[in-house]
Design a protein with these regions (language model features):
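Alpha-helical transmembrane segments and terminal signal-anchor/GPI-anchor hydrophobic tails
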Residues: 54-58, 63, 73, 77, ...
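Short acidic/glycine- and proline-prone juxtamembrane loop motifs at membrane-interface regions
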Residues: 134-140
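Membrane-interfacial loop-to-transmembrane alpha-helix junctions, especially the N-terminal start
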Residues: 27-31, 269-282, 325-330
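Membrane-interface alpha helices of multi-pass inner-membrane proteins
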Residues: 129, 160-184
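Transmembrane-helix motifs of polytopic, lipid-linked glycan transferases
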Residues: 96-112
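Transmembrane-helix signature of polytopic, membrane-embedded enzymes
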Residues: 25, 109-126
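TM-lumen/periplasm interface segments of multi-pass membrane proteins
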Residues: 18-98, 341-358
Length: 358
């Protein structure tokens, strides 16, 4: 499976160099073909390839048991109930989630910029394809709707963005943590705002290092508190990650890229009118990673849900470097760095072995 991902990744990298010169019919045909391949790869994957597929397969087969309803949303149980009328093969539900998760993301890419489709695909394949659409399949649909919601906010249709988030929460309740983006403005960042957002990211890292926690406050929220308790218990018994490294290479590089994007915010905003809200969601993702570090598994899931926006945002780096071929090459090297971490989840160390996204 990792080799198939690598093939599409390399082809997308090559096409990204001259996709602005490709006739639209060829560009969209190739993009559509890659999409079909990605859907089938997710849907027909070997059970056990990633950390979550065994659990999903078991839940699909035992959807009628009370314990299953405690582990997943009612939407998963409903879909499993319907699909079980036709087959008890878990690949049926993998295909269902892949069909909507992957196709909605590709549609979202076209809404942002149809001249950078393959560059978006490069960053999508580098991390979020494996983590969301192959592993955390419920989050796959949610994160796609999240990307669409951001676009609608930029276009002034916040009611539609709200609807996308609500629908996404139907597939994974963590979508509720995305509601604050509805209040984000999309105006170009002022100098003060740049310092504030950068300061918040750095401050969260300092608080994390000092042992700060917001667990005692969040635990009081109905339902959310129950979910937090389950995550905490899983960590205590070793079912989830027990530590999170806010000073690991992965996170520090992510912060460095955030600072770089802030520094070139004016130049990027001229080319991508989505930038102001995208950079704010990136900041939120970085903050959640450290502030929620007392429950590492939850911190990673919420953080990378917010950071799905980096598929678009990191591709904006091409607007900060001249000439274009150099810009594309640099962004693809960044994507290669993330790909090394993403493929770890399916047991394929590409460049060096890591513990995932430390």
């Amino acid at each position: 499976m990792a080799y198939l991902i690598l093939v599409i990744f390399i082809l997308s990298c090559l096409l990204a160099f001259f996709e602005d010169l490709l006739p639209k019919k060829y560009q969209y045909s190739l993009f559509f073909f890659f999409g079909i391949c990605l859907i089938l790869m997710c849907g027909l994957k070997e059970i056990g390839l990633d950390p979550d597929s065994d659990t999903y397969a078991q839940t699909y087969r035992s959807y009628y048991e009370e314990e299953s309803s405690k582990e997943v949303e009612g939407s998963f149980i409903l879909i499993a109930t319907i699909l079980n009328f036709f087959t008890d093969d878990p690949h049926a539900i993998f295909l269902f989630y892949a069909l909507f998760g992957v196709s909605l993301k590709l549609f979202a890419f076209s809404r942002y910029d149809n001249k950078r489709l393959f560059l978006f695909l490069v960053f999508y394949l580098s991390y979020f394809y494996v983590v969301h659409d192959m592993m955390q399949i419920r989050t796959g649909i949610l994160s796609a709707l999240y990307l669409l919601a951001i676009h609608e906010i930029v276009e002034g249709r916040r009611w539609l963005a709200f609807l996308y988030i609500v629908i996404g929460s139907f597939f994974h309740v963590s979508g509720l943590v995305l509601l604050p983006i509805l209040f984000f403005r999309n105006k170009p960042l002022s100098v003060v705002e740049k310092f504030i957002w950068t300061g918040v990211v750095i401050f969260s890292l300092v608080v994390s290092a000092s042992g700060g926690t917001v667990f005692d406050y969040l635990i009081e929220i109905p339902y959310v508190g129950e979910k937090l308790t389950l995550y905490q218990q899983a960590a205590d018994v070793g079912m989830a990650n027990s530590t999170i490294n806010g000073f690991g290479v992965f996170h520090l590089i992510s912060i460095a890229l955030f600072v770089y994007l802030i520094f070139f915010s004016d130049a990027i905003t001229e080319e991508d009118h989505h930038y102001p809200i995208l950079i704010k969601t990136y900041a939120c993702g970085l903050v959640f990673y450290t502030v929620l570090g007392f429950i590492p598994d939850l911190a990673a899931r919420v953080s990378f849900l917010y950071r799905t926006a980096t598929i678009i945002l990191l591709a904006d780096i091409v607007f900060t470097i001249k000439p274009r071929w150099t810009a594309v090459a640099v962004t693809e090297l960044i994507a290669l760095f993330y790909l090394n971490y993403g493929l770890q989840f399916i047991h394929f160390p590409l460049l060096w072995k890591t513990a995932g996204a430390d």
